Amino acid sequence: MVLCPVIGKLLHKRVVLASASPRRQEILSNAGLRFEVVPSKFKEKLDKASFATPYGYAMETAKQKALEVANRLYQKDLRAPDVVIGADTIVTVGGLILEKPVDKQDAYRMLSRLSGREHSVFTGVAIVHCSSKDHQLDTRVSEFYEETKVKFSELSEELLWEYVHSGEPMDKAGGYGIQALGGMLVESVHGDFLNVVGFPLNHFCKQLVKLYYPPRPEDLRRSVKHDSIPAADTFEDLSDVEGGGSEPTQRDAGSRDEKAEAGEAGQATAEAECHRTRETLPPFPTRLLELIEGFMLSKGLLTACKLKVFDLLKDEAPQKAADIASKVDASACGMERLLDICAAMGLLEKTEQGYSNTETANVYLASDGEYSLHGFIMHNNDLTWNLFTYLEFAIREGTNQHHRALGKKAEDLFQDAYYQSPETRLRFMRAMHGMTKLTACQVATAFNLSRFSSACDVGGCTGALARELAREYPRMQVTVFDLPDIIELAAHFQPPGPQAVQIHFAAGDFFRDPLPSAELYVLCRILHDWPDDKVHKLLSRVAESCKPGAGLLLVETLLDEEKRVAQRALMQSLNMLVQTEGKERSLGEYQCLLELHGFHQVQVVHLGGVLDAILATKVAP
């Protein structure tokens, strides 16, 4: 609560965070700050050797990030933001500055250097106040840094590589995230924990106090320490306009003492009321409102993809809203609002010339991009969205809602719900293809699979994962096993290339037909579709096909054991309720299932994105 008055000074200002870091965004959002996110395009190529101290480098980088955003926004629409916040976090050990690793080998080198040693985490922060005068941008910069000492335990090579393969180190200074899996590497922390996460909130609030609440004479007489955040009542006494009303010139009857006592009593009552209000006033529910209204943003994105807005803008000059509207048979006013919210979400760029795609939109949202998620988005728009409108029924009944969404009972879930027509089958395959391509490299490299000369991707759909396995392991022959209706169309998703000779397609039902022979069986996002009895049936069939020493690679989204914190996995488990007969499971649940069917030596790698990989070995009975 003491932070609210400080943050409140920025409440009605246009505040911009010049950082794409989700951790910084979360820290500031949780503190009640309202802000836009405009990632800086400043190239972080400052000469580190030219700075006398590491924190000097961090502060200068933070300042340049903020100034770049301030200038870009002003040039864009000649309207300066009120405040731009820039930040840069670095890790230093032995005089060496460590930033974000460039690849997995670099991440391993960084973490090896930190093993068993104490290092410093510096975050430089720049607060840039902007104004315009005579059509010129004027900026005032306030900057500071925070240092936190962190000590790592002695770490084994195996543990370091397991963490590197999780993918978590790749976007973090020093190659670790203390707030997530990286916390297991840390032995002790001395200083501000949030500084290590990415933003020193406490010091930031102190800096706001210095900027917006300079010390008053009476504070100085009382030797108030302004390197700390003042108590809440200090803020209430301050205002943007000093002064107050004059005293009455005529005095009422009564003794001076009586009036003094009455005045003191009234003041005490007012102060008590003021304190009671401050103590009972809850923090502004920013995060809650985002959850309540978040579906609007999601539907905006889904609709833009449905109208193929990002296809129209790919590799094209900026276009006006009216021009785009005419191409998709939409109203100009409606299209302008849709494009504006897409720009606010960072999916489009908006200039005086019109709207254009961001790099994110070109890569992921245009339907012909190499890593396009357009098919996945259409699956969510055309099917998942409708199913979730019946979530209340799913919770009450404990069953999927295809019968309500489709108007008929699905006797065979996949045949009736996903493959009922060539169009719905192709939509489902495009959805699976997009998501699999996005994660296939992480899955294929999660473990060293070079000992296996053959693999069978059970339910492998378009063969996207099979192709990545073939690319990573040139000696491996990979068979994609799926239903005949899927195999019939799968070849359309396979681009030409040297991996084609390693990949084979076989049609069949994995619950009924013999599985192709292989040394490694892969079940990628298969088991979560099914209830326990069918999971046992499928694992039993895989186990029967395995010789001792054969491997089973499971790829799923793991729940945490207490089902409290793995938000994406918990969300997907709810998704499985409305869509399928299955559910998400924890590592402990999968380990029990695997051991029951003769698979042991269970290893797990958290892939850092949306999936987790489990590798187990079939042992002799």
UniProtKB/Swiss-Prot annotation:
Effect seen on changing residue 24 to A: Loss of pyrophosphatase activity
Positions marked as site (Important for substrate specificity): 23, 89, 179
A single Gene Ontology CC term: cytosol
Known EC number: 3.6.1.9, 2.1.1.-
Organism: Homo sapiens
Phenotype when changing residue 57 to A: Loss of pyrophosphatase activity
PANTHER family (UniProt xref): BIFUNCTIONAL DTTP/UTP PYROPHOSPHATASE/METHYLTRANSFERASE PROTEIN-RELATED (PTHR43213), BIFUNCTIONAL DTTP_UTP PYROPHOSPHATASE_METHYLTRANSFERASE PROTEIN-RELATED (PTHR43213:SF5)
Start and end residues of each stretch annotated as Disordered: 235-279
Keyword field: Hydrolase, Methyltransferase, Nucleotide metabolism, Phosphoprotein, S-adenosyl-L-methionine, Transferase
Cofactor: a divalent metal cation
Impact noted for substituting residue 179 to E: Strong decrease in pyrophosphatase activity
Chain positions with Phosphothreonine modification: 234
Additional remark text: The gene coding for this protein is located in the pseudoautosomal region 1 (PAR1) of X and Y chromosomes. It represents a unique fusion product of 2 different genes of different evolutionary origin and function. The N-terminus is homologous to the bacterial maf/orfE genes and the C-terminus is homologous to ASMT. Exon duplication, exon shuffling and gene fusion seem to be common characteristics of the PAR1 region.
Subunit structure comment from the entry: Homodimer.
Family: In the N-terminal section; belongs to the Maf family. YhdE subfamily.
Function recorded in the entry: Nucleoside triphosphate pyrophosphatase that hydrolyzes dTTP and UTP. Can also hydrolyze CTP and the modified nucleotides pseudo-UTP, 5-methyl-UTP (m(5)UTP) and 5-methyl-CTP (m(5)CTP). Has weak activity with dCTP, 8-oxo-GTP and N(4)-methyl-dCTP. May have a dual role in cell division arrest and in preventing the incorporation of modified nucleotides into cellular nucleic acids. In addition, the presence of the putative catalytic domain of S-adenosyl-L-methionine binding in the C-terminal region argues for a methyltransferase activity.
UniProt key word Hydrolase: yes
Expression tissues: Widely expressed. In adult, highly expressed in pancreas, placenta, fibroblast, thymus, prostate, testis, ovary and colon. Expressed at lower levels in spleen, small intestine and leukocytes. In fetus, expressed at high levels in the lung and kidney and at lower level in brain and liver.
The name this protein goes by in its record: Probable bifunctional dTTP/UTP pyrophosphatase/methyltransferase protein
Outcome, altering residue 88 to A/N: Loss of pyrophosphatase activity
